[in-house]
Amino acid sequence: MPLMSQARSLGKYFLLLDNMLVVLGFFVVFPLISIRFVDQLGWAALLVGIALGLRQFIQQGLGIFGGAIADRFGAKPMIITGMLLRASGFVFMAIADEPWLLWLSCALSGLGGTLFDPPRTALVIKLIRPQERGRFYSLLMMQDSAGAVIGALLGSWLLQYDFEVVCWVGAVIFVLVAGLNAWLLPAYRISTVRTPIKEGLMRVIRDRRFLMYVLTLTGYYMLAVQVLLMLPIMVNEIAGTPSAVKWMYAIEAVLSLTLLYPIARWSEKRFRLEQRLMVGLFIMSVSMFPIGMTTELRPLLMLISLFYMGSIIAEPARETLSASLADSRARGSYMGFSRLGLALGGAIGYSGGGWLFDTGHALNQPELPWFMLGTIGFLTLAALYWQFNQRRIEPAMLGGH
């Protein structure tokens, strides 16, 4: 086997192992935050939404700087430092008994993600051939779903002992991942040239096509982040037990493991990337409207299943399209900036969603936040349609590869 092909093959397997552990460590802790602080301790959903939004905004909003630094110094030191920072965030979360401590823990967790997420994403572009990326992103999403279920199951089981134990287990997992990267990850350069930090940043900022695409996705992410805030709260409220949240993630895992890869293989040969993204977002948006009027667990889980189906269709296309638009001379910077939509959407989706949830309950209108989210989804869909039709992306980039 040629040396480069061998490096790609080994790198692919390491990326899969690394991703599985990162997802596991994240989902041991984060799905239980809203249950712990809102349902068990009685905090306002807005306070917890601010904490989750802060983590999202720091991790994704500052990602361009993490990516630019990785372009300059390489992936390995950034990834290791980021993993250790996230572990420290979980340690602070274990002792959080006031909102400011929860906010600090989420900020540290987000800062860690700022450092490790863009170089890890750029390594996928470096090591996976363009024609294989769509399917590889589907494999990563399948891993995400399986890891989410295993993590949520483990976290729910540990929660019966104490939330501190949940946080410490999450911290240990990220320390383990840092050790594996220190031991096994080669000192890869993620860009084709050693790009100065400022040049990488400016290259992205001048790319108006990429900027518009990233910012338009803010509305998409406002819907997507509710799997960590309002959906777990709804499941817990209707079922009456935190352990029911695991069924939500089990549904995601079953759908992803059985349908995600076949749908990606089938659709990439028949539809352009932007078509797949918009169809998925349409399904996600439609599923939002009835959730607030649901009073039984089975219909709620059916609507959540519909939401996940939309995500399964949209997410591989979104990730592949972002990678296709990245300039190879500044991959880290591009992948860092591509998270800005997630930063804005996450911050608004978490804090705004928490506020709408509290307001809806205070006004005895529990359907209010879900109606607003569905409306935002359709507005985003209209903006994407306008963008893809008024400012055409090159056909080569919109193919399935």
Curated annotation (Swiss-Prot):
One Pfam family, please name it: MFS_1
Question: Which InterPro entries does the record match to this protein?
Answer: MFS (IPR011701), MFS_dom (IPR020846), MFS_trans_sf (IPR036259), MFS_Transporters (IPR050171), Multidrug-R_MdtH (IPR022855)
What keywords does the record list, in alphabetical order? Cell inner membrane, Cell membrane, Membrane, Transmembrane, Transmembrane helix, Transport
What membrane topology does the UniProt entry give?
A: Multi-pass membrane protein
Output the Gene Ontology terms for molecular function.
transmembrane transporter activity
| Gene3D superfamilies the UniProt entry points to | MFS general substrate transporter like domains (1.20.1250.20)
Locate the transmembrane regions by residue number. Answer: 13-33, 34-54, 99-116, 139-159, 165-185, 214-234, 244-264, 277-297, 300-322, 340-360, 368-388
**Xref: SUPFAM superfamilies:** MFS general substrate transporter
Query: According to its UniProt record, where is this protein located?
Result: Cell inner membrane
GO cellular-component term (any): plasma membrane
- Family to which the UniProt record says this protein belongs: Belongs to the major facilitator superfamily. DHA1 family. MdtH (TC 2.A.1.2.21) subfamily.
Q: What is this protein called?
A: Multidrug resistance protein MdtH
Q: Which gene encodes it?
A: mdtH
